[in-house]
């Protein structure tokens, strides 16, 4: 059975979807934008700062489900410009330790609200 996971410590969904879903021992987080939930505004700065805010939001949703970044098994990173990959990757690397989650990264034409970075995750309790 699936259960919606939500918290006020991460930005609310901006469409007909859940912030996250937990089913069995699996946790699926919708694509997370760099929105500060306290202000509803993007984190100031460029790709590195946006990535840092995204991780704050991800950690808040994981905590709501009783999980941490150690439970993350897969990430998908979307960039509006692949030139921002190095800046995103530097911040990303600070948040994970080995064994790192599997990851895919894509450059896309545009992201919601013209974000520079969006990250979605899959985590497991096991």
Place the predicted regions along the sequence by residue.
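Short, polar/acidic, helix-capping and beta-turn segments at strand->helix junctions
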Residues: 2-126
């Amino acid at each position: 059975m699936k259960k919606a996971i939500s918290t006020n410590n991460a930005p609310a969904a901006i469409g007909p979807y859940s912030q996250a879903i937990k089913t069995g021992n699996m946790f699926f987080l919708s694509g997370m934008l760099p929105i500060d939930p306290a202000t509803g505004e993007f984190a100031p700065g460029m790709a590195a700062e946006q990535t840092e805010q995204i991780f704050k939001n991800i950690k808040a949703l994981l905590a709501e489900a009783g999980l941490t970044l150690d439970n993350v098994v897969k990430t998908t990173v979307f960039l509006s410009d692949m030139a921002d990959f190095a800046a995103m990757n530097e911040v990303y690397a600070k948040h994970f330790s080995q064994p790192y989650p599997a990851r895919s990264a894509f450059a896309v034409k545009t992201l919601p609200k013209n974000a520079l970075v969006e990250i979605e995750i899959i985590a497991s309790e096991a």
